[in-house]
Design a protein with these regions (language model features):
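Alpha-helical metal-binding/catalytic segments enriched in His/Glu/Asp
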Residues: 34-38
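Extended beta-strand/beta-hairpin segments
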Residues: 1-32, 43-127
Length: 127
């Protein structure tokens, strides 16, 4: 797949699910997208303090349902921060990202709809 930015994104299933294991799985990409979105927001919000931060790392972990579809029931993003910055500022940046800026976290709560275009024709649900 290729995103709007022009970069190639390689995804694949694990061998256990019939893939070759030659790319990130879609669920790994989902967690990465969430961490990336919030991480970029937090970095931008904390921009004027970045000279005081020596490490800013984001680690994601998700718990999925046992049965299909095995969507996430809980996601934890751990922010690893080293530097001379008040923890309240970091919490505020995270809150602002989640409540106001991060389109990925907002999308995880959104109603999902589907479109099908088959051979150049958009299908309606009645087909």
């Amino acid at each position: 797949a290729q995103g709007d930015s022009g970069y190639d994104i390689k995804m694949d299933a694990t061998p256990a699910y019939g893939g070759m294991g030659e790319g990130a799985t879609p669920t790994e990409m989902l967690l990465a997208a969430l961490a990336g979105c919030i991480g970029i927001d937090v970095t931008m919000i904390l921009n004027r303090y970045l000279d005081k931060i020596s490490k800013l790392e984001f680690i994601t972990d998700g718990t999925r349902k046992e049965e299909a579809p095995k969507g996430f029931v809980a996601i934890t993003i751990t922010f690893v921060v080293d530097g001379d910055i008040d923890g309240k500022r970091v919490w505020r940046a995270i809150d602002l990202s989640e409540e106001k800026y991060c389109s990925v976290s907002d999308s995880l709560n959104a109603e999902i709809t589907y479109d099908i275009i088959l051979n150049g024709v958009k299908l309606t649900r009645e087909v």
